[in-house]
Amino acid sequence: MLPVQRRKLDPLLKKYRHHKKATRTKRRRKEKMEAQCSPVPPTPSTPPQSEEDEAVDKKPTLLSAQEDTPDLLHEDRLQYLQEEGSGVMHQECQIQSCELSVAQKPRPSSPAVTSLASPPLCFGSFLSCVCQTFSRSRKQKPPRRKGNNQAEAGGDAEVLRPGPAKPELSLSKTCSHLKLIELSFVFSFIVLSVCHCSS
């Protein structure tokens, strides 16, 4: 019998081959995760003395747990990073406009350059924050239903006639309107700075 036919007829070799392949891919995945994660420092044997030490001690245990079971915690870690990133971005937006204006004041330069550089950047970061908070508030609000109370009250209750539908702006339209406003402000700053420099 040819070896190819023997391999096709014998299921044990095939199962063993797949087992080897699965073990190899798991090993590679584990090595890749270890390469991405930084090496975990050894935890001290003494008990933590303050709250900061407790917070530091919790992080290495989380990292070691993630290295042991990367597939199980992958989705939880992504969700945590997204929530943490949105919170950090929201905090950065509030601080960023002040930092930009402070950072550009000490530099000695012409008034046209500072007036052109600082306001549009601050305004752009402000608008991006507005868009993000608006999108968050739209996601958190549950949809309202107005006709349910009257339907539950009985047949004697007045039935409201549906009036003309109110146009609701979607998030993308609102952000595009804000971008247009931002562009108009930038253009007005440019025109005013050019007029100021020429006079």
Swiss-Prot record:
Composition bias, Basic residues: 14-30
InterPro entries attached to this UniProt entry: DUF4672 (IPR031445)
Domain of life: Eukaryota
One Pfam short name: DUF4672
Region (Disordered): 1-71, 139-162
Protein name, as recorded: Uncharacterized protein NECTIN3-AS1
Gene symbol of the encoding locus: NECTIN3-AS1
